[in-house]
Amino acid sequence: MNSTKVPPEWKRRVKSEYIKIRQQKRYKRADEIKEAWIRNWDEHNHNVQDLYCESKVWQAKPYDPPHVDCVKRAEVTSYNGIPSGPQKVPICVINAVTPIPTMYTWAPTQQNFMVEDETVLHNIPYMGDEVLDKDGKFIEELIKNYDGKVHGDKDPSFMDDAIFVELVHALMRSYSKELEEAAPGTATAIKTETLAKSKQGEDDGVVDVDADGESPMKLEKTDSKGDLTEVEKKETEEPLETEDADVKPDVEEVKDKLPFPAPIIFQAISANFPDKGTAQELKEKYIELTEHQDPERPQECTPNIDGIKAESVSRERTMHSFHTLFCRRCFKYDCFLHRLQGHAGPNLQKRRYPELKPFAEPCSNSCYMLIDGMKEKLAADSKTPPIDSCNEASSEDSNDSNSQFSNKDFNHENSKDNGLTVNSAAVAEINSIMAGMMNITSTQCVWTGADQALYRVLHKVYLKNYCAIAHNMLTKTCRQVYEFAQKEDAEFSFEDLRQDFTPPRKKKKKQRLWSLHCRKIQLKKDSSSNHVYNYTPCDHPGHPCDMNCSCIQTQNFCEKFCNCSSDCQNRFPGCRCKAQCNTKQCPCYLAVRECDPDLCQACGADQFKLTKITCKNVCVQRGLHKHLLMAPSDIAGWGIFLKEGAQKNEFISEYCGEIISQDEADRRGKVYDKYMCSFLFNLNNDFVVDATRKGNKIRFANHSINPNCYAKVMMVTGDHRIGIFAKRAIQPGEELFFDYRYGPTEQLKFVGIEREMEIV
């Protein structure tokens, strides 16, 4: 789209419309300020008059202490040079109070937060007149670090979201008027064709190939309606005004009145404002700001499946938001730690534990198994080999949590044929619900869009287990589900569903030389001690992890979040320790990692109750920190003290804060150095933890060249985290120190007092 040359006429048109919009904004803003000033002045005068009318005189009634006769008094004999009667008052002595150390506002948090880079300087920090006198160029250098971008400075090419939308609409009106003058009725025909194309794409489920060359996606029918004649009549010359730059334009007005802008409009804006992005990026931004439907853009998100506008869509569209926003590393939606592009996709590999097999007996009187000829069909299907045989997979070389399910205390009373456990009370309740639906015949059954979408989601999980699908839906009997499935199977091939799963692995024995593996871990740790990169799950299904794998390129182990095979040679296997995992005999401890509860089960890291955990290498992920007390320090400012004692190498606390990039840390660090107070802590080669704005109490631990604590960056379930540990035995009430790793110059500049060593 950007390769097309923009005519000079369009560039002049964009510049002219932009100047008009800026002038209108300026005049409107001036009128708003004037009106606001008048309103505030009237309200102020009204409040002042009320105070004058209801003013009260305060009468001082001093309290005289019992020893008032012995207190020294102050005497006044004249006022402004005019003699007056003597006035005496006792002198009250206010003793000096030691002020508490200065503290800047910060938000307490017990976890790290990933934040975006600040490319615009929001405010110019005040350093005091002394700093500006000594280094007058500091502010200039600071602004240069942000490429001269300061919040509030509106350069000639300034354009916020509201101006951008108004500029697009103004160009659309001028473009439409130009077509009207060239050929009467052309603009109306183009507008009608565009809107009709959009409606047809929604009604017929057909969408053209988009601008990026993506394959077309079939869209389902929608209930959207529109009258093209009324749209043509409502065309106006008035610009769309918004009251605030942060407020989006009227979405419904944009949808109903205006067609989608022509590509030349975004190309012309991009040519005049290249710093705002390419034409395609501006197009995406316009869609986001106005929620305008691009007729050439396939739909991604659908209405809520529980809402009244639920549509009958494919499984991919139904699960789009879940797959996009759900973080499989935090098990949260829209987590604060991992960015969307870093979210691992769903792992489509076959599970190793048993699947829920179809029921052998009918689940109710309305079960699909009671259909004539169904038992013979099911018997024939049972002779076909299953998709996956769970018993064929070797578990000796597996470190997944599922490989040791046999050691758990499961209830096997209701399980049959290695199936999953089914609670009898739950089955009875479900059967009662299904029995109440027996009177609903298949002819009376209505499959809403929500029912159809939910079936497509469950069908990929339970396959042909229609009883299980019906038990989950609770609105249809399994016979109704079976009949609907036959219609769906005509359009959806079951073989395509089988291909989504990993084929079964053949039974094989694989002897792991544990000592060689531990030696490999140590070599990898030693070679990459100075090059620690952030972990991002690799995603190359069907291909082994080689030099093209992102994990191998960054010298990281493949984790359980990677979409590579579970037999990957680069995947960390966990440990098999029977002890506390606090020595180098443990592979996890040796690799500076915490034990993973999904991988390390022999050491007790997978136990939910803390009383059953024998592993000492899970403190960071479980939050087993010490009780810390904050108080003024004898060294500098505030300090942090330990309420209870700690043994050597015992976990104290995690250093939490904002996770920022190295570039952002350089920009912030220049300001912190001037304040002579920094909370930056290197996490890896990509990110830094900054506890200035957000953090926990360990941020107040002071520096010492002879500390009683040490910091260690550990890999905790795929994330680098900073743990503070006791370097020696620490007594209760002792202040905590760790080495900031200052250079000789910074040591003398920032740390003027060194605590005295106490011999215990």
Swiss-Prot record:
The modification Phosphothreonine is found at residue 502. The keyword Flavoprotein does not apply. Residues 626-741 form the SET domain. Residues 215-237 have a biased composition (Basic and acidic residues). InterPro entries: CXC_dom, EZH1/2-like, EZH1/2_MCSS, EZH2_SET, PRC2_HTH_1, Pre-SET_CXC, SANT/Myb, SET_dom. Signal peptide: none annotated. The keyword S-adenosyl-L-methionine applies. Pfam families: Ezh2_MCSS, PRC2_HTH_1, preSET_CXC, SET. Residues 518-619 form the CXC domain. SUPFAM superfamilies: SET domain (SSF82199). Polycomb group (PcG) protein. Catalytic subunit of the Esc/E(z) complex, which methylates 'Lys-9' and 'Lys-27' of histone H3, leading to transcriptional repression of the affected target gene. As part of the PRC2 complex methylates the PRC2 accessory protein Jarid2 on 'Lys-46'. While PcG proteins are generally required to maintain the transcriptionally repressive state of homeotic genes throughout development, this protein is specifically required during the first 6 hours of embryogenesis to establish the repressed state. Belongs to the class V-like SAM-binding methyltransferase superfamily. Histone-lysine methyltransferase family. EZ subfamily. Component of the polycomb repressive complex 2 (PRC2, also known as the Esc/E(Z) complex), composed of Caf1-55, esc, E(z), Su(z)12, and possibly pho. PRC2 associates with the accessory components Jarid2 and jing to form the PRC2 Jarid2-jing variant (PRC2.2). PRC2 may also associate with Pcl and HDAC1/Rpd3 during early embryogenesis. This complex is distinct from the PRC1 complex, which contains many other PcG proteins like Pc, Ph, Psc, Su(z)2. The two complexes however cooperate and interact together during the first 3 hours of development to establish PcG silencing. This is Histone-lysine N-methyltransferase E(z).
